[in-house]
Every structure is written in structure tokens, then in C-alpha cells.
């Protein structure tokens, strides 16, 4: 299972929710979705994982491989990243 960190009022995150909805409609549930802008505990977890690699949300993360994607991405970027994760 992957994790998608987002901010509730983040416009870039809203677009990525749409992308995840479409992806998961095809492939099943892949992501835990974690809101961090209004949840200090989850924000601290994200900061520990991020290690200043991205510095914000949207942040897609695979805890098994410690790989990630940052920011608003294109559908093909997510598709390629997921394939690289050997689903």
C-alpha cells in the first residue's frame, strides 16, 4: 500500500485526488490518503519521511522502497512510478 499525503485546501492536491480516483477505479485501492495541513501528528510523520526531499504536498510515497513523487504530476508519471514499484 502506498501513501498519498495532501492538504485539505490544496488545489494541486485536489487534482491529484481526481487522478488517484481514476487510477484506483482501474487497479483497486492502492493509496492510503493522509491529510497533513490540519493534522499536526500526520504532518510530523510526513516531515520525517520527506527529509526535505519535497518540502510539501502533494507527496506520493512507497514505504517499502522509500521512493516518492512530489507535486502535481501527470497521469503517465504516476503510471510509470507504479509500474516501477512492481505492483
Predicted regions mapped to residue ranges:
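Structural motif
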Residues: 40-46
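Local sequence-structure signature of Cys/Sec-based thiol-disulfide redox active-site neighborhoods
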Residues: 1-32
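Structural micro-motif
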Residues: 47-61
Amino acid at each position: 500500500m502506498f501513501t498519498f499525503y495532501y492538504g485539505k485546501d490544496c488545489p494541486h492536491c485536489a487534482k491529484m485526488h481526481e487522478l488517484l480516483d481514476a487510477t484506483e477505479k482501474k487497479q483497486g485501492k492502492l493509496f492510503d490518503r493522509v491529510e497533513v495541513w490540519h493534522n499536526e501528528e500526520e504532518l510530523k510523520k510526513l516531515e520525517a519521511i520527506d527529509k526535505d526531499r519535497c518540502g510539501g504536498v502533494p507527496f506520493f510515497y512507497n514505504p517499502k522502497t522509500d521512493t516518492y513523487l512530489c507535486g502535481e504530476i501527470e497521469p503517465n508519471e504516476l503510471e510509470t512510478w507504479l509500474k516501477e514499484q512492481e505492483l
